[in-house]
Structures are given as structure tokens and as C-alpha cells.
């Protein structure tokens, strides 16, 4: 009797950096960061059909931006985990690419993390297995935080994760459909190996974060005390980033507007879903070619 193999599916939720401090650049060239990270309700979809040879089939509105399948982080993550777990059963991945590429919301990293979760499920591996987290770190700096896809403070080069319960936030995310390569933004930041960022010490004094159930105003005040150190260099690479932030900040009901990651996606937090939806509709009407999403961050 032929065994029926059931396909497994995961959502690869977009990552949003509510704050992002660049502490400095290590002597090995990696940048030390501290960032409050949350996840949006928009996502790519990833499915694994266990038992097949390792492969990737990509579709969706952003598929042409992905490049060759062999370079996709899904395949990279699977191969790295296979190196660490002898006898790992892989399979055929199907990616539904919905999120913008090179957008500062960890689309590729979220896809890779979803692949690791799928392989963990199909092989009986715990998500906190050191081998899985090692594969995540080797795949990319944003992959470890995307494995759990839970709000946290991310430190180091992405491997230090401290849970930070946040309330559900109404938000609008906007990408002007321009790519902002991370390497170009860090190059514009201009730190040399071993150099600290101006005005930042080795230890960043984090604010006393409110309780999850605290009034929204307390959270906005705490988040407003932070910054994204990559905003200024991203504006040098793509000036439209500044236009997007200004547009979001000017929307009725916007409480905080900022860039996520290394850009070009920016976000604004609103006091209600209705205000966020109205703002998103207005922005989409004015800029029909932009990617605009009204939803929640958590």
C-alpha cells in the first residue's frame, strides 16, 4: 500500500524593526545591532512536500524579483541544516512570494526560517535545537529572529534574542517599489572595522519598556525615544525613503513613522485599524505602483 505523504505549510511573516541601533562594526566586519522587532500579518507562503529531492518552485507576484532558485535562502537554509543533521529528510518546497524583495522586512529571511520550521516538523526536530539555530545563523543575520517570529529585542549580529511582549499595533507598511541593498546602506553608514557608531556606546541603555497591557501612548513614547540608525544612509541610497516617511507621518492618526531594517519599507503606527485602513487607501490612490499594506504588528 502506497504511503500518502502530506504536504506541510508555514507562513513566512514580514519582520518589522520598530527601532534599530547600530552599536558599531566589529573587527570581523559584522555590525552589532540592537533592535525591537515585531512581525506583521502579511507573509509569504511556503509548502514542503516531504520525501522528494531538495528543490524549490516559486510563484506569486514577486517571483520575478527572487533571482535564481539556487540562490534562494530557502535552499541555503535547507542545505545548511542537512550538513548539521545527518540523514535529514528534505523535499520539494513551493514558495508563494507576496512580500517585496530587498525591502527591509526580512522577506527572504522569513522564507528561510519557514523552511527550517518545516524541516523541523517533518524530521521531529525541536525549534530550539542548537543545530537548527546554528543553521539559521549561518543562513543570515535576520533568520534566527524569524524562526520564532515573536516580538523581541534582537542584539549582537542577530543571534541574541530577548522576548519583549508588545500589544497588537495597528499599522500601515509602505514600500515604494525600489530596492535598497543592505550592503549599500551599511556602506553609506561608513563604519570601519572596529569602529563604534557616533553617539553610541558598547552598552545601549534600553528604556523601561511598558507592560503589554499599558496604554498605547506609553508604548509610542518608549518607541519614539528610539531611532533607526540606518534611515539617514538609506535616504542617501534612495531619497524616496524620506518621502515615504514624511507621507506616513502626515497621515491622520499616525502616532509614529519610521523605516524598517535597511529600507525601503517604512511603517506608521496608528491608534486604530480604521485610521490605518483609511491612510493606506489614501496612499495607494496617490501612489498606485507602491506596495501598501494596512494590518497589525505583534
UniProtKB/Swiss-Prot annotation:
<feature type="binding site">
    <location>
        <begin position="100"/>
        <end position="110"/>
    </location>
    <ligand>
        <name>ATP</name>
    </ligand>
</feature>
<comment type="similarity">
    <text>Belongs to the GHMP kinase family. IspE subfamily.</text>
</comment>
<dbReference type="GO" id="GO:0016114">
    <property type="term" value="P:terpenoid biosynthetic process"/>
</dbReference>
<dbReference type="InterPro" id="IPR014721">
    <property type="entry name" value="Ribsml_uS5_D2-typ_fold_subgr"/>
</dbReference>
<keyword id="KW-0418">Kinase</keyword>
<dbReference type="InterPro" id="IPR020568">
    <property type="entry name" value="Ribosomal_Su5_D2-typ_SF"/>
</dbReference>
<dbReference type="InterPro" id="IPR013750">
    <property type="entry name" value="GHMP_kinase_C_dom"/>
</dbReference>
<keyword id="KW-0547">Nucleotide-binding</keyword>
<dbReference type="InterPro" id="IPR006204">
    <property type="entry name" value="GHMP_kinase_N_dom"/>
</dbReference>
<comment type="function">
    <text>Catalyzes the phosphorylation of the position 2 hydroxy group of 4-diphosphocytidyl-2C-methyl-D-erythritol.</text>
</comment>
<dbReference type="GO" id="GO:0019288">
    <property type="term" value="P:isopentenyl diphosphate biosynthetic process, methylerythritol 4-phosphate pathway"/>
</dbReference>
<protein>
    <recommendedName>
        <fullName>4-diphosphocytidyl-2-C-methyl-D-erythritol kinase</fullName>
        <ecNumber>2.7.1.148</ecNumber>
    </recommendedName>
</protein>
<feature type="active site">
    <location>
        <position position="15"/>
    </location>
</feature>
<comment type="pathway">
    <text>Isoprenoid biosynthesis; isopentenyl diphosphate biosynthesis via DXP pathway; isopentenyl diphosphate from 1-deoxy-D-xylulose 5-phosphate: step 3/6.</text>
</comment>
<dbReference type="GO" id="GO:0050515">
    <property type="term" value="F:4-(cytidine 5'-diphospho)-2-C-methyl-D-erythritol kinase activity"/>
</dbReference>
<dbReference type="InterPro" id="IPR036554">
    <property type="entry name" value="GHMP_kinase_C_sf"/>
</dbReference>
<dbReference type="InterPro" id="IPR004424">
    <property type="entry name" value="IspE"/>
</dbReference>
<keyword id="KW-0414">Isoprene biosynthesis</keyword>
<dbReference type="Pfam" id="PF08544">
    <property type="entry name" value="GHMP_kinases_C"/>
</dbReference>
<keyword id="KW-0808">Transferase</keyword>
<feature type="active site">
    <location>
        <position position="142"/>
    </location>
</feature>
<dbReference type="GO" id="GO:0005524">
    <property type="term" value="F:ATP binding"/>
</dbReference>
<keyword id="KW-0067">ATP-binding</keyword>
<dbReference type="Pfam" id="PF00288">
    <property type="entry name" value="GHMP_kinases_N"/>
</dbReference>
Amino acid at each position: 500500500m502506497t504511503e500518502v505523504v502530506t504536504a506541510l505549510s508555514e507562513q513566512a511573516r514580514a519582520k518589522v524593526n520598530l527601532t534599530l541601533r547600530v552599536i558599531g562594526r566589529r573587527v570581523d566586519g559584522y555590525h552589532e545591532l540592537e533592535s525591537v522587532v515585531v512581525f506583521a500579518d502579511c507573509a509569504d507562503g511556503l509548502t514542503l512536500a516531504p520525501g522528494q529531492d531538495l528543490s524549490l518552485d516559486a510563484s506569486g507576484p514577486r517571483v520575478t524579483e527572487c533571482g535564481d532558485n539556487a540562490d534562494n535562502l530557502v535552499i541555503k537554509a535547507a542545505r545548511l541544516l542537512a550538513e548539521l543533521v545527518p540523514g535529514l529528510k528534505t523535499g520539494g518546497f513551493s514558495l508563494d512570494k507576496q512580500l517585496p524583495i530587498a525591502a527591509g522586512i526580512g522577506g527572504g529571511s522569513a522564507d528561510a526560517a519557514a523552511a527550517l520550521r518545516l524541516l523541523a516538523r517533518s524530521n521531529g526536530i525541536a525549534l530550539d535545537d542548537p543545530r537548527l539555530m546554528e543553521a539559521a545563523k549561518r543562513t543570515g543575520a535576520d533568520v534566527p529572529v524569524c524562526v520564532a517570529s515573536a516580538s523581541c529585542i534582537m542584539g549582537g549580529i542577530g543571534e541574541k534574542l530577548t522576548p519583549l511582549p508588545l500589544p497588537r499595533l495597528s499599522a500601515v507598511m509602505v514600500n515604494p517599489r525600489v530596492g535598497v541593498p543592505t550592503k549599500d546602506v551599511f556602506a553609506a553608514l561608513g563604519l570601519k572595522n572596529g569602529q563604534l557608531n557616533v553617539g553610541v556606546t558598547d552598552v545601549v541603555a534600553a528604556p523601561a519598556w511598558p507592560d503589554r497591557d499599558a496604554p498605547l501612548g506609553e508604548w509610542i513614547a518608549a518607541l519614539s525615544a528610539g531611532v533607526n540608525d540606518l534611515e539617514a544612509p538609506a535616504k542617501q541610497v534612495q531619497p524616496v525613503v524620506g518621502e515615504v516617511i514624511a507621507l506616513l507621518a502626515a497621515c491622520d492618526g499616525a502616532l509614529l513613522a519610521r523605516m524598517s531594517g535597511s529600507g525601503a519599507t517604512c511603517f506608521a503606527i496608528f491608534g486604530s485599524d480604521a485610521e490605518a485602513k483609511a491612510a493606506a487607501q489614501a496612499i495607494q490612490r496617490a501612489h498606485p505602483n507602491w506596495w501598501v499594506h494596512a494590518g497589525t504588528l505583534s
